[in-house]
UniProtKB/Swiss-Prot annotation:
Organism domain of life: Archaea
CC per GO annotation: cytosol
SUPFAM superfamilies: Double-stranded DNA-binding domain
NCBIfam families the UniProt entry points to: PRK04239.1
Xref: InterPro entries: DNA_bind_arc, PDCD5-like, PDCD5-like_sf
Keyword Membrane part of the UniProt annotation: no
Record-level Gene Ontology MF annotations: DNA binding
Family from the record: Belongs to the PDCD5 family.
Keyword field: DNA-binding
Keyword presence, ATP-binding: no
Name the UniProt record assigns to this protein: DNA-binding protein PF1087
Xref: Gene3D superfamilies: PDCD5-like
Annotated source species: Pyrococcus furiosus (strain ATCC 43587 / DSM 3638 / JCM 8422 / Vc1)
Length: 112
């Protein structure tokens, strides 16, 4: 009887180890996919942004990461749709950031 309990414990432990390894592999694959996507986004941004515009976007990313991510994704989509034909300079980047910031800005009103 004690041997049966040990066998059950051993099987259960092996099952748990197997599940853990499968989860770990799935997580590693997801991280690898995310890194690949991020590398592709950065490659596209290097192609369409001047160094000054990339620098501005990097500074915005430090302060407002959500806004910077949104701008990156919009620029990539526009590039893939063929709507960006020339490099975006710092002045254009300022306009883009201002437009997107205005669109996503939330107003807070306090009523008494």
């Amino acid at each position: 009887m004690a041997e049966d309990i040990e066998e059950i414990r051993r099987r259960k432990l092996m099952e748990l180890q197997k599940k853990y390894l499968e989860q770990q592999k799935a997580q590693e694959e997801a991280e690898r996919q995310q890194a690949l996507i991020e590398a592709q986004i950065q490659a596209i941004l290097r192609r369409i942004l001047t160094p000054e515009a990339r620098e501005r976007l990097a500074r915005v990313k430090l302060v407002k990461p959500e806004l910077a991510r949104q701008v990156e994704l919009i620029l990539v989509q526009l590039y893939q749709a063929g709507q960006i034909t020339e490099k975006i300079d710092d002045a254009k980047m300022k306009k883009i950031l201002a437009q997107i910031e205005a669109r996503t800005r939330r107003e807070f009103r306090i009523k008494w």
